[in-house]
């Protein structure tokens, strides 16, 4: 279990997800040979989130999460905000093994209204390996007029091949003659 801290009005876990792209791969059974090439197939072990936030009709809307920490704030006078980022899954090995790896996260909307009221809404979203998930956020005048829509982008992030070529040299011993 991790400790929960307070930061800028959000609760978040000390086990947050790094905002970076990451790839993982393994090479088994390779026997080095002269002129041989070791190719390692890498898989993305990250997911993407894209927030499209329509400003509230009054007050300030904050978007948080217990572990993702997006730190998004939009006021009534702001323009529609569009921001995206990638995060690395914590269970890298499990993510690499499973083609359709997913994990659920709770997105928290906190709406501080101009009349002093604070409304909070939560929705669980599912992040998928190698998928940019678009989260459309819209809050309106009453507590029943709010929505948090989640749309999975149709286009894949794509794949990249990385060739890792190493020249280990020969395995002959080199005589070392120290000079004094």
Language model region names:
Residues 30, 64-66, 169:
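Generic beta-strand hydrophobic packing signal
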Residues 114-180:
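Hydrophilic extracytoplasmic domains
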Residues 54-70, 137-150:
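Repeat-unit-sized solenoid/scaffold elements
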Residues 42-57:
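A short, Gly/Thr-enriched small/hydrophobic beta-strand-prone motif that recurs across taxa
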């Amino acid at each position: 279990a991790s400790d929960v801290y307070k930061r800028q009005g959000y609760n978040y876990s000390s086990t947050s997800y790094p905002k970076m792209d990451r790839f993982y791969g393994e090479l088994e059974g390779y026997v080095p040979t002269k002129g041989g090439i070791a190719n390692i197939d890498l898989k993305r072990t990250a997911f993407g989130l894209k927030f499209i936030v329509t400003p509230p009709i009054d007050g300030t809307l904050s978007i948080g999460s217990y572990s993702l920490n997006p730190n998004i704030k939009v006021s009534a006078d702001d323009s529609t905000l569009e921001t995206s980022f990638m995060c690395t899954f914590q269970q890298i090995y499990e993510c690499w093994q499973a083609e359709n790896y997913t994990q659920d996260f709770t997105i928290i909307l906190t709406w501080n209204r101009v009349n002093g009221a604070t409304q909070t809404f939560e929705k669980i979203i599912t992040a998928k390996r190698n998928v940019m998930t678009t989260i459309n956020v819209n809050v309106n005048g009453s507590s029943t007029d709010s929505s948090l829509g989640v749309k999975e982008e149709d286009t894949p992030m794509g794949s990249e091949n990385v060739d890792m070529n190493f020249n280990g040299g020969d395995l002959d011993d080199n005589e070392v003659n120290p000079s004094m």
